[in-house]
Each structure stands twice: as structure tokens, then as C-alpha cells.
Amino acid sequence: GNITLAPTAVVMPIYHEPVQRALGGMRAVFQELAQQKQAEAVDFYVLSDSRDPEIWLEEQATCDRMRAELGAHQRLFYRRRRINQNYKSGNIADFLRRWGQRYRYMIVLDADSLLSARCIIHLIELMENRPQAGIIQTAPRLARAETRFARLQQFANRCYGRLYGAGLAAIQ
């Protein structure tokens, strides 16, 4: 659409995650937002707490390559903390102290999260339309299950997930 989105940070705290998978999902979201002419409102941050130099050097190189390939020099940022105090919550708190004032909203992705651009736009619109909301939590959904047990969980999630999510939302 032609709506103007509020400034939003999409942050992905990572710690020794499979780099190509984690950043591949972020790349896909960035490209989809750009296709919908909505990329200007959204900045992406990879917030690394990785300790292994081999891993964080791959993270940094992958982010640099993505920035160049996507023309995202002012939209995609990589930051690695030298001291990973308080784990993931400390990583996000550090981001908020340093850069949080630049944005009206923040969307936190896990390294294995897959969100469409449409979903991100919808989340921003929800936050914009509900200023009293402090947190909007999506209902997680399993995807690409491989083991028999995981496929059973995925099936149950498809059958009951929406009902469970609606019930949980109603009591909050």
C-alpha cells in the first residue's frame, strides 16, 4: 500500500546461530518490504552476542555482503557486544539504550523466525492503531517439521493453534 509507516526497528538478537539461515530470513523480509515500497521506514539490526571469532566474523561478513547486495547501507546494521551481560534481554536493552530513541516501534525476531513483509506492516499498523499496547505477541507456528513427533506437533498446532491463541488473547 501507499501508507506511511512509523519508524520501526526490526532487531534479531543472535548467539552462535546458523548465520546463513538466520540472515537469509532477514534478507527475504528486507527484499519483500522494498518490493512493497515500505523499506524506508524499517531498519534492521543484527545484535550479536556470539563469542566464537569464526562465527562472529561470518556474521559480520554476511551482513556486509547483504548491505552491499541490497543497497541497504543505512537500513541494515550489525552490532556485536564485547560483553554479553544478561544474555538476550541484555542485548535488547543495550540496543534500546543506544538506538531506541530513533524508533517508535521495535519488532524482535528470533534467529529462526520467518515473518512476511505483510505481517511486519500489519504489526506496525496494529501498534499505530493501539497506542495503549505495550507488547503485541504473535502466536508461534511450527514449520518444516522433520521428525514424526515434530510433524504431529505441527499438525496439532494447525488444528488448535488459532483457538488457543484466541483464548489466550481473551484472558489477557
Summary of predicted features, one role per range:
Residues 105-109:
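Short aromatic-hydrophobic micro-motifs that form the base-stacking/packing surface
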Residues 7-11, 43:
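Cell-envelope/extracellular polymer assembly enzymes that use nucleotide-activated donors
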Residues 28-84, 141:
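Acidic donor-binding segment of Leloir-type glycosyltransferases
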Residues 110-114:
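The conserved acidic donor/metal-binding loop of glycosyltransferases
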Residues 17-25, 54-59, 83-91, 115:
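Phosphate/oxyanion-binding active-site loops and adjacent basic polyanion-contact surfaces
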Residues 64-104, 117-172:
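Long helical/loop segments within the catalytic core of UDP-sugar-dependent glycosyltransferases
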Residues 14-18, 51-53, 99:
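Structural beta->alpha junctions
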Residues 1-2:
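N-terminal membrane-anchoring/stem segments of glycan-assembly enzymes
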